[in-house]
Amino acid sequence: MSTPDLNDGRSQKERMLAGDLYIADDPELSAASRRAYLLTREYEASFAADPAQSRQVLAQLLGEVGDGVHIKPPLFVDYGFNITIGAGTFVNYGLVALDVARITIGRDVQIGPKVQLLTPTHPLDPDLRRAKYEAAESIVIGNNVWLGGGAIVLAGVSIGDNSVIGAGAVVTKNVPPNVVAVGNPATVIRHLGAH
């Protein structure tokens, strides 16, 4: 496969945000990743001691945080700025949200411990992987969704409103609203009816 043209006038960050192949260890992206790491550590340190301060740190870290959002540390992100979380959402310990592409989490979502939201993808071509190229696809979690502990949501997936993803499920394809999906790969096992 031919090497992508990285001299199209866009920065690696612009390429990343557009969903195109980019080089992840670009200095601008590396600095943004370090900033996110430091803010997540600051969030952890202030979580129990100073809730108001932890809320301010979360607002600095994430792209958008709705009212009443509660995130138990530790929290792991690539950049933070690509994550929006709707009001009333609860996130248990150990969320991994690799936000190379946008991650949108709706209102009143329940996220169990050690859930992973993984937007990065890597080329199948070994030469491109060796050259450190990667890309990403967005993840969208609808309103009032419950992600069970240890669930993994892969790049490009949308989960519809009111759906439940069972603990340990690996979500590789879109999940419609008002269903229960479990397993690897996640499969719909029950319809919940419209709400």
Predicted features and spans:
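Terminal amphipathic alpha-helical/low-complexity segments used for targeting or macromolecular assembly
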Residues: 1-68, 186-190, 194-195
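Short, functionally important structural connectors and interaction interfaces within domains
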Residues: 8-9, 13-14, 67, 77, ...
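Short secondary-structure boundary/capping segments
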Residues: 13-14, 61, 107, 131, ...
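Flexible, glycine/small-residue-enriched loop-and-beta-strand segment within the central core
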Residues: 75-86, 90-158, 179, 184-186, ...
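Short hydrophobic beta-strand segments in globular cytosolic domains
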Residues: 148, 154, 166, 171-172
